[in-house]
Amino acid sequence: MTNLSRRNALKNLGAIMALPLFMQTKLFSSENAKKGFKLITDGEVITGAHWGMLKLTIKNGKIIKSEPYEKILKIKNPFLELTGDLVYAKDRIKYPYVRKSYLQNPDDPKPELRGRDKWVRVSYEDAINLIAKELKKTRKKYGAEGVFAGSYGWKSSGNVQNSRILLHRFMNMTGGFVGVLGDYSTGASQFIMPHVMGTLEVYEQQTSWPVVLENSKVVVIWGANPIVTLRISWTVNDDLGLKYFEDLKKSGKKIIFIDPVKNETCQFLDAEWIAPNPNTDVAMMLGMMYELYNSKKYDKEFLENYCVGFDKFLPYLLGKNDETPKTPEWAEKISGVSAKTIKELAHTIFDNRTMIMSGWGMQRAHHGEQPHWALATLCAMTGQIGLPGGGFGLSYHYSGGGVPTAKGGVVGGITTGSTNSGGAEWLEVASKYSFPLARISDALLNPGKTIDHNGQKITYPKKIDFIYWVGGNPIVHHQDTNKFLKAWRLPRTIVVNEIYWTPTARLADIVMPATTSYERDDISMVGDYSNIAIVPMKQAVKPIGESRNDFEIFRDLAEKFGVKDKFDEGKSELEWIESFYDGAYKQVLSMNLIELNGVDMKPFKEFWQENKPVKFLSTMESESYIRHGDFREDPILNPLGTPSGLIEIYSETIEKMHYDDCKAHPMWFEPIEWLGMKNKPAEFHLVSSHPTDRLHSQLNNTSLREHLAIANREPVWINEDDAKAKGIKNGDLVRVFNARGQILAGAFVTKNIKKGVLKLSEGAWYDPLNSSEENTLCKNGSANVLTIDIPTSKLANGNIAHTALANIEKYSGEAPDLTIFKHPDPKA
């Protein structure tokens, strides 16, 4: 399978690092002093985060100002101003804590009391000893199969302090663990698209923005909100993705926006808005395909020379095998978009060079394998795949997809000590046993169960006794919170490294205080796809309380297992940073970029002392890059990674799986819950989009929440006609509920959402009214309390967060106080 993602090059070059044990407070008086570096107590420090390069102003050893390193955008990114909030948050975990019942008897820890028990502060040494003792106990009784450390989440940026990979490295060196397959973002598409296009597509470089701006006549944005999602990147944001959307706005091109919500991007671009019912994108695409075929506006030559299986798909499209032609009129009844609009859209994308930029929300739905497969088929019919400015792209909304890649050095990163996956870093399968990430609840609730997955059988562990989670917040980001809570209370031991008292930390047994990325040194590339710079992530302030770097925690644990030297390889943290930088420096020297391109890259000591990023330039080749252009030029010499080497509209591989919920070609499946179903369990379709004021659940405890909250809760968008019918006014406190749970939210009444649809952004911290009560009210408005926890299909087993119906009503009771942002230890 081919994978061109620039992120892979970044993440798969390095090795791990370590630092002297129990020396956090002495870091800058020892290691840095020996190198001649001092902590800046008054002045400016350059660093980076998911939301971009930062310039921090330090006074008397404290952060007093946070701002962008460079101001290149008209669009403001408020995340860049929140560093002080993050470091000095009231809910910082400053010390190690152990849940009282667990500390009293780890063999009978009363897991049902998680979230209600008292916390006991312990010493760091005692916490390390307790974790090591209980992990050894689990390993002795259950082996690697008893330890779950999949631990998915948006951990901090940085190539040294990668908490998840540090955890995996430690676990691999001490006996193995149970991990996960896939992720929450693209759980369906990352498994279906290799069958269709031969590669992940979702984490691949896109046709470059300069090519799009020069050649595309029409840009269709389908189910995405890049003005919001491009505020962040997996590494350090380069801001250039947003800059290109500013350029798109000024270009005068026809822009069409397809989404049930007229979101920030649609409004910013002043685009034509088409609003289908949620989860009906495939029906709409099929209607467009029927119109193209019926009007003979399709590229027969492209389908014959670059694709396989259109002839097997066609009978379904024409209704010859189910007596249901997929006409625009048929699609109208399902999608709510008029047949006239569907026909016009089909002709528009065929008659004009069109780039369809798709988001990922449509595949986080029941049968989520189908939308991007159908989209690839639609674009194959237009014959524009591989042409300048034509076809489709699945990553323009993410981490700067389409920003030309720079030519320069690439710093290495931490490894798990296992065989590399050759894919995106967080998709690396480092564990001995793995199951699909979205099936965590199912695996805990049904030990030993065997499931289908992408043509294979996977059996869940017979007993998960020990969970270790870092860099994530699963209580918030997993679907059907109440079901997840039942599963979460089954293991004997749960350990969490965390910066704040998140819902996940509150539901653990042992909590280790972790530093923010502003309290430690690190290094990172800038731009997931562009690799436009190397930024020194210099420590800005001393750690708060007894918080420790994640690598320190795992190095200390490794010492308890006798593998410290193997874990750290005898290097300190700064030495690992230096070695990664030196690797990139050698690459630059070998390409003679200092002389040829004027790259200002110096030996490490000067780089670190100078306190500024090293910048690289994009190339003419990257600026003219066309996704699948080589394949288009010669499909024989440049085949795709599919069995046929061609675009597989019909997959014989999938056909042999004999799945009833994912067949051999794209098709419309009725979701388990949607607006068109009979006997609806609730009235409205709930979409849980990316939040404007957070990175998933990160930043929910900052001042930004206070500015954007409504009725001091997560906002829920409701159409003005629906609100009037329900007696709801803008700013009202409302209850959103279904059979799975109930939440409080603040009503945002607007015309910018389709009737019958509610929008409640994911990521609000779960705040139960009564944690001892089943299906209790979430006071803060966590969307996953309402979502469904079943797989997309047997093929991908992705999550279906966007498939859910819910009711809404004005809340008549007294508004309860939020407690989730308060420290659980009154003595702290």
Language model features with spans:
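N-terminal leader/propeptide and maturation segments of large enzyme subunits in energy/redox metabolism
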Residues: 103-126, 297-337, 540-636, 641, ...
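Acidic/polar loop patches that form or flank catalytic/metal-binding clefts of enzymes
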Residues: 179-180, 298-301, 342-343, 355-356, ...
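Flexible glycine/proline-rich, aromatic-decorated loop/lid segments
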Residues: 264, 503-536
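Short beta-alpha connecting loops at secondary-structure transitions
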Residues: 270-275, 532-543
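Active-site phosphate/pyrophosphate-binding segments
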Residues: 288, 309, 313-439
